[in-house]
Swiss-Prot record:
Location in the cell: Membrane
Organism of this sequence: Arabidopsis thaliana
Name of the top EC class for this enzyme: transferase
Protein name: Probable ubiquitin-conjugating enzyme E2 33
Record-linked InterPro entries: Ub_conjugating_enzyme (IPR050113), UBQ-conjugat_E2_core (IPR000608), UBQ-conjugating_enzyme/RWD (IPR016135)
Gene name tied to this protein: UBC33
Highest taxon of source: Eukaryota
Domain UBC core, residue spans: 5-162
Length: 243
C-alpha cells in the first residue's frame, strides 16, 4: 500500500508533466495503480534510435520519493534487455546515490540520455547501428500489439495508423509509377514495329515502281510500232498494185 506522501508526490508530478511536457518523453500512471507508471521515449534525431518509440515501465516503492524506483523497457531497442531492470544511478540498483529531489521527468530524461550512450551496465546489450535502426523502425508496430499501450497512449496508436496509410499510399504510387514507366517501352516497341511495317511497304512500292519503269523502258515507243505496221501494210499491198 502506497504511503500518503508517495501518492501525493506522484499525483503532483503527473500534473506537472501534463502542464509542461518534457521533450521526447511521455509518462502516465496506470489507471489501477499509482505506483506503476508507463512511459514512451522517442529516439533523438542524429542517433541510431531516431524514429523509434520505446515503451517501458517504472515501478515506484511505497516509500517514494525517499527510495528509488525500478525501471524496465518493453520495446526491443538494441541497447537494453527487455523486461529486465536497468542499472542506473536513478534506479533501485543504486539506492545509495538516490536523490529524493529527482522526479519522473528527471528519471526518464536521464534514461534517454543513458540510452544514447554505449556504456555497458547491468541490463544493457551491445548491437550494431543497423540493428538499432531496424528496431527503431519496427518499434511502433511492436508497441501497438500491447493492450495496455493502446489504452494509455492512443496518440501513438493514431500515429501508427497514419504511418500505415502513408506506407500503403507510397507503395501504390510506386506501383503506378512502375507501370507508367513500362507503357512508354510498350509504345516505343509498337512505334518501331509500325515503322518496320511502313518501311517494308515503302520498299515494296519502290520495287514495283522500278519494275514498271523498267518495263516501260523495254517496251517500243508507240510511233515506232505505228511505223512498222505501216511498212508491213505497204509491202503487202505491192503485189495488188502490180495486177
Amino acid at each position: 500500500m502506497a504511503e500518503k506522501a508517495c501518492i501525493k508526490r506522484l499525483q503532483k508530478e503527473y500534473r506537472a508533466l501534463c502542464k509542461e511536457p518534457v521533450s521526447h518523453v511521455v509518462a502516465r500512471p496506470s489507471p489501477n495503480d499509482i505506483l506503476e507508471w508507463h512511459y514512451v521515449l522517442e529516439g533523438s534525431e542524429g542517433t541510431p534510435f531516431a524514429g523509434g518509440f520505446y515503451y517501458g515501465k517504472i515501478k515506484f516503492p511505497p516509500e517514494y520519493p525517499y527510495k528509488p524506483p525500478g525501471i524496465t523497457m518493453t520495446t526491443p531497442n538494441g541497447r537494453f534487455v527487455t523486461q529486465k531492470k536497468i542499472c542506473l544511478s536513478m534506479s533501485d540498483f543504486h539506492p545509495e546515490s538516490w536523490n529524493p529531489m529527482w522526479s519522473v521527468s528527471s528519471i526518464l530524461t536521464g534514461l534517454l540520455s543513458f540510452m544514447m550512450d554505449n556504456s555497458p551496465t547491468t541490463g544493457s546489450v551491445n548491437t550494431s547501428v543497423a540493428e538499432k535502426q531496424r528496431l527503431a523502425k519496427s518499434s511502433l508496430a511492436f508497441n501497438c500489439k500491447s493492450v495496455t499501450f493502446r489504452k494509455l497512449f492512443p496518440e501513438y496508436v493514431e500515429k501508427y495508423s497514419q504511418q500505415q496509410v502513408a506506407e500503403e499510399e507510397a507503395a501504390t504510387q510506386q506501383t503506378t509509377t512502375s507501370e507508367n514507366q513500362d507503357f512508354p517501352q510498350k509504345d516505343n516497341a509498337k512505334v518501331e514495329s509500325e515503322k518496320s511495317v511502313g518501311l517494308k511497304k515503302e520498299s515494296i512500292q519502290e520495287v514495283g515502281l522500278k519494275e514498271r519503269r523498267r518495263n516501260k523502258k523495254e517496251a517500243l515507243p508507240g510511233w515506232i510500232v505505228l511505223l512498222l505496221v505501216s511498212i508491213v501494210g505497204v509491202v503487202m499491198a505491192l503485189p495488188l498494185l502490180q495486177l
